[in-house]
Amino acid sequence: MPPIPEENILSINIKTYGSFVKLPINHLAGHTVISIDVLRSSSCIVWGLVNGASKIIPVDDLGSAVSIASRMGDCVLAGERGAVLIPGFDIGNSPAEYTEARVGGKAVVISTTNGTGAICKSESASNVLIGSMLNCTAVAKRAVELGNDVILMCAGTGGEFSADDIYAAGAIASAIQTLTDAELCDLTRVSCLV
């Protein structure tokens, strides 16, 4: 990628949260949140879209997921709790399940232990993007195009950070740094070193 002319370089602040539980939702307006749950929600969502899902609808609670799916009719109901497929759901949270044959042309309603909670908690942000190792360069480019300060919001596990999410946050932050001038918080700096 050719360098961006200096007069076009945007300065973006990047802040990383190790767990969505710690995310201050009253400070999201004007920010682009990149929600990261590498193992597995984010990877499932990205892989589902790659394989032709018409849309992905993240839902925090199971009752709402079932209700939305039943109203929609022909859709795929996906989800897990504690890494276990939910009885009555079509698929769980393994990207290998999000094949073109399974999700192509269909809406996917997904509810997971951590990932969809992180996405839903971000709804007051100006923009919400899904980040994983599968799309770190593309999501970084889109975040820079949007021009807002960025929050890398790791889903974590049980309210604590997960190394896989921090690793992906570092890959995304590093990709953003190749595109623009960026101010990094300490956790973002550390994630870039992982």
Question: What are the residue ranges of the model-derived segments?
Answer:
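Short acidic, Gly/Ser-rich segments with clustered Asp/Glu that frequently serve as metal-coordination loops
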Residues: V21-L23, V33-I45
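Structural motif
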Residues: N13-K15, H31-I34, S54-I57, D74-L77, ...
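A short alpha/beta connector and helix-capping loop motif
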Residues: S42-G63, R71-V76, R81
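Long, charged alpha-helical interface segments
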Residues: P2-P3, D90-G117, K121-N127, K141, ...
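Acidic, polar low-complexity linker/tail segments
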Residues: N8-T32, V50, V59
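Extended, compositionally biased flexible segments
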Residues: V66-S70, D74-I91, P95-Y98
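Phosphate/ribose-phosphate-bearing ligand recognition and processing surfaces
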Residues: A155-D165
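Solvent-exposed alpha-helices and their adjacent loops that cap or buttress functional pockets
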Residues: P5-L10, P24-L28, I68-S70, T99-V103, ...
